[in-house]
Amino acid sequence: MTHPDTEGGQETDLALSASAPLGRYPSPLAAWLGLALLCILMLTAGLNQQIIFLVVEPLKESLSLSDTQIGALGGFALTLVSALAILPLGWLVDRVNRLRLLAACIAIWSASTVGFALAQSFEGLFGFAMGIAVGEAVLGPIMYSLIADMFPRDKWVRANLIMYIAGRLGGFASLAFAGTIIGFAGSGDSVLPPLIAQLDPWRIALIISTLTAPVLIILTLMIRLRSGATVKAQTGGTSQGLFIYFRANARALVGVFLGFGIVFAANGGAAAWFPAALQRGFGAKPTEIGVTMGIIGGCAAAFGVAAAALLERWLRRKVGDLTPMVMAQFATAGTILATPVMLLAPDLTAIYTLYAAKTFLLTVCLSLSPAVLQMLAPSHLRGRVIAVGGLITIIFSSMAPLTVGVLSDTAFHGPKGLMASIVVVSTGRL
C-alpha cells in the first residue's frame, strides 16, 4: 500500500506519484477559514434535499403523485444519478481547478433546486432532481481532496473529524432549518415578492434555500490552497495508474468500500421516508418533525463523535489499523437491534428515542471512514478513489427509497405501513 509522506511542508506520494512535490500550505488562519466555508457548503447542500424529504405529503397532494413516484425521485433521480455522475466528477477533481469545479457545481444544484420548486409535473421534478444530484455529487470527492491541499498530513485527522462533525451536525441543523423555512413559507406573513408568495409553501421553501448561492460561489473561489495544488490537479495520475493502485490494494479497499457503504445505504437511503412515516403514523407536522429531528439528531451525533474519538484511542492500542472496522461492526449490531423496535413504538416520544439511539450508533460507525479513505489514497488519485467509495455507497443507496415506496404501495398499508416498509428495507440490507 502506498502512503503520502510529509516533510518540510511538502508531500511526496510513494510508488505512484508522477508529479513534483507541492509548495507551502496556506497559513493556518486561511486553512481553517477555508474549512469553515466547506462546512457551510455541506450544510447548504443538504438543505434542499431535507426540505424535499419533509414536504413529501404536500408534494404528493400538489401533483397527485404515488409513493412509487416519490421513491423514484429519491432513489433514482437524487441517488442513482449521483452514482452516474460521481466517477466523471471524481476524475475532474483530479484534472481541473478544484475550486472552480466546486463553484460550478454550487450553481448547478442551486439552479436545479429552483427548477424543482417551479416544476408542474413528475417528469419536471425528476429532471431537476437529476440536476440537484449531479451538482451535489462532487462534494465527497472534492471536499476531502481540498482538505489535503489546505492542511499538512499531521492535521488531516483533526480536519477530517471537524468536517465529519460539520457534515453530521450540519445535516441535522439543515433538517431543523428546513422545518423552520417550511413554517415561514406557510405562515402567510411572508415578505416575499407577490410572484413567489402565491406559490405553495413547499415551493417557496425550496427557493429560499438557494438564496445564499451567489455569496457562496464567490467565497469558494477565494479559498487558499497550497501553491501548485491546481497544477497538480490538472496533471493528475492516469487511468492506468488508478487500476494499478486498485489491484495492489484490492483487499483493503473492498472491505472499506463495501463495509461502510452498506451501513450508510441501509440507514441513509430508507431514512428519506422517515418524516413522511411520522406524518402518516402519528399525525406530526413537517415543521415539528424537522425541528425535533434536527435537535435530537444533532445532539445524538455530537455524543456519537465524542464516543467515537474515545473508543478510537482505546481500541487502537489493541487492534491498530482495524479500529474503524471493529467499531463499525459493533455499532451496526446495535443498529440492527434498534431498527425493528420502531414498529412497536406507541408514540412520537418512543420513536424519537429510538431515532436518537440509531443516530448515535451510526455516527460511531461512520465517523472514521473519511480519514480511512483519505489515508489509503495517494494525492494524485485521491479524488477518484473517494469517488469510487461514494459510487459504491450510492449504488447500495439508490434502490432503498424506491423499494420503500413500492412496499408501501403494494405490501404494507395503513397508517404505519410506511414505517414497516422502512424497517424491512433498513434491516434487510444490514
What do the PLM-derived regions correspond to, one by one?
Residues 163-222:
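Helix-loop-helix hairpin linking two adjacent transmembrane segments in secondary transporters
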Residues 100-115, 322-340:
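Structural signature of the two symmetry-related core transmembrane helices
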Residues 52-53, 249-305, 366, 400-401:
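Extracytoplasmic gate region of multi-pass secondary transporters
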Residues 84-122:
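Conserved MFS/SLC helix-loop-helix module at the cytosolic interface between two early adjacent transmembrane helices
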Residues 128-167:
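Cytoplasmic helix-loop-helix junction between adjacent transmembrane helices
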Residues 64, 97, 118-123, 152, ...:
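Helix-breaking motifs and short loop linkers at transmembrane-helix boundaries and internal kinks
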Residues 17-28, 225-256, 281:
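Juxtamembrane intracellular "pre-TM" segments in multi-pass secondary transporters
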Residues 73-90, 295-308:
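Central cavity-lining transmembrane alpha-helices of secondary-active solute carriers
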